[in-house]
């Protein structure tokens, strides 16, 4: 279980081993070419032992047997080589996480718990078995670097186990392929009888292939994948025929039902260990993680995402549960993380379960996911008498070497000097460049595959090449680069060890007297390339530090050293690494270059500019990621989301990044908001909040505010969403701008910026005009609203202090620019006007607006936008009345109570595009209708029965059904009534609730 959950469960290369042995018995032939051998199902069977085995382990459950107990050799090997190393790595990561934990008391408690248990039990069984620690384990497993370490442990560990326990390698009862009978096409059934080496039957496996029920699942990135064919194997639960231990490993199938190549294969494995009576017992299940099921029913098939592809496993949910019960029975306690199948992990939509039509959403997976990347493995160098058998189809061309050259390993087995003699003789004899590269690769691979003095021997080989006078300088560059490529592809040498070799190679080449600076730079750049391909950031950082140190310590001139450091920086800058890591690596190179006075001021400036660009890009991405998190946070309501995104907006405005990056960031944030699945009112509120945050910023220059508003509207206009939604969000932005009443002139400029933002999009002219009209309409509404608020409580006939009225006159002058001519504009030469004149003019303007408000607003609308067909207040009222009548009429067409309730919910509560006034008027009309209907029913003597009086509360209800007396009684009573009183009450209640919610 658990991190036995890997894809390399022990069987993927069975056929490879067999064919390897076969080939070794043949005469020397042409070199073996890489093949696309498909993976196959495998099994192993170990005869009964004289000692009883123990329950199998479960990685994180604390069920590992004690050291003095003897277990099945394969399980024991997995335990020691893979699982314990993984647990140590996980524990280390948890300790790192605890160091950063805010709750210091809890962190210290957990740290002590781990440290103290380590002293008693290196396996940390209790810690990993405690459900309370699940959160710490899950958090650790989310770290990409830890995942890579765990995967690396598994790859190396399983590789060793496969070699040791393969039947093809002579291990008695070792792994071999399952031989299925020919498939019976009519029913898609096939079977096989599994036998041990003595020919005794162990069990019969039945396999059913399903091609008639395709279903769709979603990958992590949201991509939908259709599964057209999958299979289910009836794994045995009890084995009572032959004694011993057995391991069944079934390869996962691709989405089309075919088997993958061996270098991509993953497996579902059942481990049956010898029990007290000698018979195999099901004690362990290994599978890749996270394991998911295509539905909730017993026939739902298991599947996983691995290396970006979807694979189905040969087990159904029902069979898996059955197997897990048996595992629990023999282990005596629950199984670990990998075996948990919480009901909420799968979500089925569309057709019913029987038709297997689920959609599994990407976030519904176990956090403790461990997936192994596809790896390219370099084959070991074998003596010349044996042809090479390459294991994967992805071997670089340079690895396919002529077998006649393969004497390097034999030479190295005598001494390093013999190897050098062999290489030098070959280089002198062979003038073909490719053959020379093959020869050097062979020697380098022999060194890397030999654990003894690996690093020292590698340095000796590099020196030999650089100083070999038989090679031209350009040839030396090609040969050294080929050796560096061999280092890169070697899977058996840890990255930290490789980094030392890179440092040494750079030092040797830079100090060489017979290479030009350009040739030295080419080799340096290749070394950096190899370093940047390392699996984890620590190894990469160590290697870059080593290479930087080698440049600084070299005998190059200061100028050439500076050029080399810039070359290192350029390689890092152009890499695919994260911005955060680029910052770290570039910063380190720059710091050392400055401290040692190697980098010139110009070079320092160039590297600093690259760093600044990365920092800006990182800041932008961080802000965008933060907004995505806010939008997706289920704990945040709209108010909280708006406040949080306002904070992000302010943070962007205050950050030291360039105006260009600020604009891109604000545009991206707005576009994400606009395209989010939130309802349009929520999105409008958030955009309004962004507008307010920009307009009300107190220290920002007006020109920068204007540019920021333009970027936000560009994000709205460019978003892929409905035009009506864009119009509402544009209005929201204008509302946000008007929330700040500090400077009407700046407000006016920001309104122009909204238009520019619209123009930045690629929308059709009609849509652009519609957005601009929406902005104008919102601006006019806000200006009118501000006037109305200013008029409240004013008695314009009473004298007011000069300042109060003068200020109001100024406000109106700004707001009605190009619309109303004020005393200030009419008399530019007459700045010294009397208080009375100002008061009279202002009073006149305010009176005009307040007395004939409707007329003024209509005129203002027409003057502000004569071409944009804005509606007058009367037109809006008429439209509203018409809409109310339509809604009331449509409600009348709904016959059942359920339909009427649905109508109320959809049209009067959920539909935010309708104004509050329309919805409230509709509710009032419908309430009047319902009250009228009820009144008519009461007044009509023909239907005024005793039953009706019972419902009216004039006599007591008598129970009819003990289960639901009131409901049954009501049904009986109103069945005789022309107006269904109960339903009438329901509808009135629903309408009143709707009114309250508005």
Curated annotation (Swiss-Prot):
Residues 12-21 have a biased composition (Acidic residues). This is Antigenic heat-stable 120 kDa protein. Keywords: Cytoplasm. The keyword Cytoplasm applies. It comes from the Bacteria. It comes from Rickettsia akari. Residues 46-68 have a biased composition (Polar residues). Pfam families: 120_Rick_ant. The lineage of its organism: Bacteria, Pseudomonadati, Pseudomonadota, Alphaproteobacteria, Rickettsiales. NCBIfam families: Sca4_fam (NF038365). Residues 1-69 are annotated as: Disordered. The keyword Translocase does not apply. It is found in: Cytoplasm. GO terms for cellular component: cytoplasm.
